[in-house]
Amino acid sequence: MALPPNSETERGLYLRNLFYNTSPVDVFTKWPKLTAEDQALVGRVINIYSFIEINLRRLVESWEDAALLPKGRIKDLPLGKVEELAQTVLPWPEHNLNALKRMAALRTFRNLVAHFGMLRFPDDDAFLFIAKSEADYKKQTGDESAEDAMLIAVLDGPILPGVVVELEGLLMWLATVTAQILKQKADAKAVPKPN
């Protein structure tokens, strides 16, 4: 699973140290749970990205149907391959290509909120993400985990609403582009072929 890249900042180190210096019992029993507003943001990230995936798949499948891609199992491709094809099949203007690349980068946030447990830091506007997955641990660190090691990430609170706003804009653009491309394809099929 693709996760956001690790970025060492002073703030991130401070937040991670708060976690490391707190007993797991206290983290799991005393740290604040997500608020209703937090949960709504998480749901929006997951839902918006689901619609981004739907539109990316519609594009790639339409290109396969139009013979821009070889016939095959396009419908079975993992999302990362679909994102790659969406970026490379057409000669996109630079700003459109950047939008597609940004969607792929932001999928890592969707993965984070969808696959990690989330808590709030007690005295900071920040989120703690916790997972226990050996495969993801190895992918992130290159090593096997020690007994009871957890994969964690931290995120400042204001970042998540900003991601939602950015994803909403990207989705609106992608939905419009997808509709235009599918309409062009339908219009081209409606033109009678010469005898």
Named regions from a protein language model:
Residues P192-N195:
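Short intrinsically disordered terminal tails
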Residues A2-E84, H95-T108, L112-D123, I159-K189:
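Amphipathic alpha-helical interface elements
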Residues W92:
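Acidic/His metal-coordination segments adjacent to aromatic residues that form catalytic metal sites
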Residues H115-G162:
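A mid-sequence interfacial segment
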